[in-house]
Design a protein with these regions (language model features):
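Extended, structured, electrostatic nucleic-acid-contact surfaces
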Residues: 307-314
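Short, amphipathic C-terminal "tail helix"
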Residues: 452-485
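Extended hydrophobic-aromatic, low-complexity segments
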Residues: 288-289, 324, 336-338, 349-350, ...
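Basic, nucleic-acid-interacting segments
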Residues: 1-304, 321, 342-346
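Structural motif
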Residues: 318-319, 341-350, 388-391, 449-452
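Strongly charged, low-complexity linkers/loops
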Residues: 370-380, 390-464
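Core structural elements
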Residues: 197-209, 314-336, 347-364, 377-379, ...
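Amphipathic alpha-helical segments in well-ordered regions
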Residues: 69, 237, 340, 353, ...
Length: 485
């Protein structure tokens, strides 16, 4: 474990490169299907395999998705771009090159704002967002002796999101990746599943003494299949680099892989320079021209974004930052909440129900909100039933909500059928209080002798006697009045 005093001497500098597979029906430059989970090497064609004489055709949806992400990150959308070939030889790259954007990325600049657990915000600047195609996948753990190659992924369209070196800790990297995943899901351009490889991250990490004027030696870390593993890999690499320098060693610019089982990084190769890839213009694709009308069309179709919803919930609906952050963590949850508040003005209650009972049920059943059996209108009806004083929150949660999970009836219909509507009949309230007090004379005497905490006992007995059909606040006050006589 690295001593905190030693660590505090150094500044950590991190830049992240995120590759997001786009949710298009077909691949970037061919009509091959873009799907995950099919049998190996079944989603390929002569174009994917790089056969002589085949020509790429641009998938226009990838341009729309790139613009969508660029707008969400306040990037500059380039008017004219050229494509390039990135050349290298590897078994899972049948063409021997990837089509990418080298000197003219579709998006430049921009930023993504991250939040820490205390609500503090920090902008992470973006260098660029560019389009490219994915390589195939080498599989090392099926055959003992051979590496197998699946080319289904080859040619899948990617967006590479490159940050400036603004990230200063593993926790900030975690927060940034969480925001990226949330954003691409809101935009419907990537499913964000790191476990399936549709969102991948490479981290460039260096350390420098706090009074130094030049960055330290950069090390790239790959092979991280979850946001948590990115955080673990960065944390290990920071400690490794500082310990090496403190022991008088030197660092090499290299690429390292993260071993999730051991929690360490291991050296893969000396880091390549850009000229090692021999970039040159892609001769088979014309320049891409993007006009303001194209950008305006995408802008008009943009969905609500998490930051805008967060500001709406905190500033307009007066929800806490905690509630707003949790509601916007999932696009589907946020959209469900939006539907609920169309039918009720008690925004806080709507948030509480969704983050409480609704999410608990989803977690217990292992389902998403899309499969939740209570639609937004019916949940709003339940909330309104409580607001109107017709049922208590306890009765709603314990009796009506469970019944709604297995019925298509409204909350009011279920409450009436189960005889749960709260009574306002004073005679019935007085009769229930008399029954409770007459049945518990010893507890009444103790209460009158100063054991005021027994009010909880009397409340429990009263709610049983009344069948929970009296407003708890009304019942509490009526009980206190009777006990003080």
């Amino acid at each position: 474990m690295l001593d905190e005093t030693v660590r505090s001497k150094y500044k950590v500098v991190i830049g992240l490169e995120v590759h997001a597979q786009m949710l298009t029906e077909s691949k970037a430059y061919s009509s091959d299907a873009n799907r995950y989970g099919d049998a190996p090497n079944t989603l390929v064609s002569p174009i994917t395999l790089g056969h002589p004489g085949t020509l790429p055709v641009m998938n226009e949806k990838t341009i729309e998705y790139a613009i969508r992400l660029g707008l969400a990150c306040s990037c500059h959308i380039s008017e004219k771009q050229y494509f390039a070939r990135k050349n290298y030889f590897y078994p899972d790259l049948p063409k021997g090159y990837q089509i990418t954007q080298d000197k003219t990325p579709i998006c430049t600049g921009g930023q993504l704002i991250i939040r820490d657990k205390d609500g503090n915000e920090k902008p992470v600047r973006l260098t660029r967002i560019h389009m490219e195609e994915d390589a195939g996948k080498s599989i090392h753990d099926i055959d003992v002796y051979d590496t197998l190659v699946d080319l289904n992924r080859a040619g899948v369209p990617l967006l590479e999101i490159v940050t400036e070196p603004d990230i200063e800790s593993s926790q900030e990297a975690y927060n940034y990746l969480t925001e990226v995943r949330k954003l691409v899901r809101y935009l419907d351009i990537c499913d964000g599943n790191m476990e399936e490889g549709s969102l991948r991250c490479d981290a460039n990490i260096s350390v420098m003494l706090k009074d130094a004027t030049e960055f330290g030696t950069k090390v790239e870390v790959k092979n991280m299949n979850s946001i948590r593993n990115v955080q673990r890999a960065i944390e290990f690499e920071i400690s490794r680099q500082i310990e090496t320098l403190e022991n008088g060693g030197t660092l090499s610019q290299e690429t390292r892989a993260f071993d999730a089982l051991k929690g360490i990084t291991v050296s893969l190769r000396t880091k390549e320079a850009a000229n090692d890839y021999r970039y040159f213009p892609e001769p088979d694709l014309p320049p891409l021209h993007i006009h303001q009308a194209d950008i305006d069309k995408v802008q008009a179709s943009m969905p609500p974004l998490p930051r805008a919803l967060f500001e709406k919930y905190t500033q307009t609906l007066n929800l806490s930052e905690y509630d707003a952050y949790n509601l916007t963590d999932s696009k589907a949850i946020a959209l469900y909440f939006e539907q609920v508040i169309l039918h009720t003005s008690n925004y806080k209650a709507a948030a509480n129900w969704i983050m409480g009972e609704v999410k608990s049920y989803l977690n217990e059943q292992g389902i998403e909100i899309e499969a939740f059996p209570i639609d937004a209108l019916r949940l709003a009806g339940l909330i309104n039933l409580i607001n109107e004083g017709k049922v208590s929150n306890t009765i709603a949660a314990q009796r009506i909500f469970p019944a709604m999970l297995t019925s298509a009836e409204s909350a009011i219909a279920i409450a009436e059928s189960l005889d749960l509507i709260q009574t306002t009949d004073n005679n019935a309230v007085e009769a229930a209080i008399k029954l409770v007090l007459d049945s518990n004379p010893a507890e009444v005497a103790r209460y009158k002798n100063g054991e005021k905490q027994l009010i909880g006992f009397f409340m429990g007995q009263f709610m049983k006697a009344s069948g929970g059909k009296v407003d708890p606040k009304t019942a509490n006050q009526a009980l206190r009045n009777a006990l003080e006589q």
